[in-house]
């Protein structure tokens, strides 16, 4: 019996072999087998040196069979040169989203709009509820120890540290080939200490993070007048739990949290497994930790023992009848022996592997339920799982990241495997995205982790662009608006260009204090496409000094050529030249030339001169016979049904949430594309003003500008935005539901260009033909394609940083009210509104 309780302000443990013996109390500082942590290495009390690496996992199960095979082969290459003993540890716990919530609270305090503050309050409550129900976080560690080449030779500490660092770099190189990154920490000692503290203080580490715990210990020393001892405080005082209780046969109490240790016995494995089969255990859920041990054996000794055992079994089988039960066992043993012998002859190594499973819970009933569920899970896979009865203390010590599996547990659970078998246990398989400063997308359907991504974090994402692909009714608009609202909640400038069903964006814009600008023949709103806009370059000048004096007129005329090419697709080269001359003449009549000083209004130096409008271009074009055809086509926008385009700009883009609705132009396909370009041109000018301010431009149905109904000039303009918006701290979110048109222009050059310039892709439900097309472009596996064709509304695949995850997109009730288009949900909202009025 061994117990440990907090006493006299110091953690302590009591141990004894019988109840008659007087129990001897020892401090937890002495009990934990850790001497110190220095140079990023754990120095153990039995004079070993242990290194911990944290590994970033990948989404192995969604990779194609060919990719999975490549990963396994890369892992085999690592195992060939890895340390003799390896411990791979996975810990799971409730996701700690406190940093994300704290960031959200700070953003709410900075918000001035009351409606937006309500949205932020609702978001915080929603994320908290979601995380309490289903959010699980997982961390993966690779642990190894220093292995002396010659046990008789005395080795200096610097040689040991150098050897461990070399082993760490080797692991980093080979795991990178698997697709895994080894996380680099600014302070390795702090990282290692935090890992141990987290393991030993499951719930307390959330309430009392390590820095706070350190302060508490230091304060205790200072208050008790022991200032001179502060520099010599043992590391275990900072990381040790307050209490340990080993009195029970099938569980341990650590700080009041129940821990039960189980193992897979020697004969508890399946004979044949799939690559990455450990994901079954790794994704089992909250409170399930996995420790996977590998111990490489000397090949020469194993070959000798194998030969002896095969000969013994062959002599035994001669005396056994083929109807005897022993005959089958001996036959199987001989076959296994020859299999191992053949593998060793083919340059494979021989390992003993062990699986130790830790199950944690807040109370005994929950612990027992989790144990039973875990056993059922393994039985369903033809595997066995046994509790470490009366060996719980050994299980506790073995689960520490010290590469020190207890001998009894080792003998009970060791299973022999060759290198290929060991590599099939590739464990870094459960990828998750959880950025403290990001926005919530939803829940990872494979491992129940929250998907919170900060697309503006340039350290993680090469660019902030997102491509959203999905068929009609797949939830594309819903996903877009959820993202837009959450970006607005963070204070990010949001622009939305809506060419179809613009009314679906109105309710959300109105309820967050946004601006809804409708560009249509019947609307009073107008963006003057001829306007050379005064750009605020103050931030850019502070950063770079005086800007280059490039001609603003030349830049504007270049974009006007795109506008007129959309309006008049069949312009000849001669007409393009004549149009160019007409545009220069139009601006000249307003006193504007290629010199930027000519833009300044002498009466109001802070403003530009009055700009020409399309009617002024029309007048110039009507003056010569060769340009009258162009004038007649332009006439619709000057004197005809679309004359609302023939005004000075009367809209403002300073609002943090701006929707430009051009859906009323859908009656004329050429006008819709023209209107979409005008809106995007105006937004792009605004987005380039301040390179330090985050902004997002949402372009719905982008196929209108880069597809068959557009032309190369307009498509190049959109592609250029996708390429360089990152330089202006911006994100381009491009959505489409018509993949055939999206990839139609120039054999899909511009559609592929947009995809390639979006680090993150969101693929919603698609028809089989569309999914096959995307499969080739995004290099998706058959499993992913099958998922895409069967996705329910609100589910999708997020592809980012070479990982694909299946996500259920989540929205709070308030967000749903603002963006839903579902008829039944709209009726319920209407009923609630009627009750309020009543």
Which residue ranges define each predicted feature?
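Sensor-1/coupling segment of RecA-like P-loop NTPase cores
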Residues: 725-742
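P-loop NTPase motor core of the ASCE superfamily
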Residues: 123, 129-130, 149, 164, ...
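P-loop NTPase motor domains
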Residues: 41, 53, 58-59, 65-81, ...
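A short beta-strand-to-loop transition that corresponds to the Sensor-1 phosphate-sensing loop
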Residues: 500, 734-739, 766-767
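Extended, folded cores of ATP/NTP-driven motor/assembly subunits in large transport
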Residues: 1-428
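The start of beta-strands in P-loop NTPase/AAA+ ATPase cores
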Residues: 49, 140, 493, 656, ...
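Glycine-rich phosphate-binding loop of nucleotide-binding enzymes
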Residues: 37, 436-521, 715
